[in-house]
Design a protein with these regions (language model features):
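Catalytic domains of riboflavin
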Residues: 1-367
Length: 367
């Protein structure tokens, strides 16, 4: 079964239909049912509960969450993909127990109405909102952001109802299963990677605002400063040599962590991670490569918590911050002309980076 174009996906959403959305065309991908929240009916909720079987969620923009005075469930997500769950909600009026398909549909409409405010909903409830990152899939390549983006492109409020698709036996549906599901229910299938491509034709959320040569202990680098217009934050890239050649360059996408980069703290289990200095040294040894430095301000409390997390012997989930910033780092690499790369990282599944015309051909772990 062929993957449908984003234009076809948007048209079905505009008509109030559901679609299936995967990360990309990989056979191991899972998929969500998705439709515009403004168009949801009780029968749609019933279909999602009966056939999708996952957790029915409502994707909302940060602005809408503020409008509803809706706080995040936790201030820092420890989920593997950094999903921003808010407190669950119920419509303040017009529902009974809240769990029926009609009640859940009513709750969704109460939350996405133009004039909706905090008085229109109560907590807890049977609908689980997810707060999308500003910038949508160009900043975080997730189903939450894709739901908001697709609803907006289709002409509706930037809010969608999504649910993971599970098989009869309770396992997650993969592409082969999703194709059979789509054929059975006459649904179109799209990908977040294609949505990223679609948006990049006309928009982006980062721009290079300065370039200058700097001399470091590892040699000369060209320092590029980027402005993330979605969050009004600055990030940097350090480039050495000609990275536009036929051979994939070394690439490190690095998120600042003072406990690691300044104090040199390492995991008690012996696992070594790439510090900023190690990455720069590795690039200098080879003579060509890129270090993208994504900078997010840290307070003393943030650093203290980070230290506790790094020295704890308890296994930790990783990748949540990485997952959230895939889009930002990918846009910077695109701007620098990188396509195929040898990534300074332990093996990690980077969602939908094909949408940015990027491909990891090799992972290089820190030794």
């Amino acid at each position: 079964m062929l993957i449908n174009s984003i234009e076809e996906i948007v048209e079905d959403i505009r008509q109030g239909k559901m679609v299936i959305l995967m990360d990309d065309e990989d056979r191991e991908n899972e998929g969500d049912l998705l439709m515009a929240a403004t168009m949801v009916r009780p029968e749609d909720i019933n279909f999602m509960a009966t056939n999708g079987r996952g957790l029915i969620c409502l994707t909302l923009t940060e602005q809408r969450c503020r409008q509803l005075d809706l706080p995040l469930m936790v201030s820092v997500s420890k989920a593997s993909r950094g999903t921003n769950f808010t407190l669950s909600i119920e419509a303040a009026h017009g529902v009974t127990t809240g769990i029926s398909a009609a009640d859940r549909s009513r709750t969704i409409h109460a939350a996405v109405a133009d004039t909706a405010c905090s008085k229109d909903i109560v907590q807890p409830g049977h609908i689980f909102p997810l707060q999308a990152e500003a910038g949508g899939v160009l900043c975080r390549a997730g189903h939450t952001e894709a739901g908001c983006d697709l609803a907006r492109i289709a002409g509706f409020e930037s809010a969608a109802v999504i649910v993971e698709i599970m098989n009869d036996d309770g396992t997650m549906a993969r592409r082969n299963d999703l194709e059979l599901f789509a054929k059975k229910h006459d649904l179109k299938i799209g990908t977040i990677a294609d949505l990223i491509h679609y948006r990049l034709v006309t928009e982006k959320t980062i721009s290079c605002i300065s370039e200058r040569e700097i001399i470091t202990q590892y040699g000369k680098f060209m320092l590029h400063t980027y402005l993330d217009t979605a969050r009004n934050e600055k990030h940097f890239s350090l480039v050495m040599g000609d990275i536009a050649g036929s051979e994939p360059p070394l690439v490190r996408v690095h998120i600042n962590k003072s406990a690691r980069d300044l104090f040199g703290i390492e995991s008690p289990d012996g696992f070594k991670s790439w510090t900023l200095s190690r990455a720069m040294e590795k690039v200098a040894e080879e003579g060509r490569g890129v270090v993208v430095f994504l900078f997010y301000p840290e307070t003393a409390d943030d650093i203290d918590c980070s230290i506790d997390g790094m020295i704890s012997p308890i296994p930790k989930k990783t990748g949540d911050v990485v997952y959230q910033q895939i889009g930002t780092g990918s846009q910077i690499l695109m701007d620098l002309g990188v396509h195929k790369m040898r990534l300074l990282s332990a093996p990690f599944r980077f969602t939908a980076i094909s949408g940015f015309d990027l491909e990891v051909v090799e992972y290089i772990s820190c030794e």
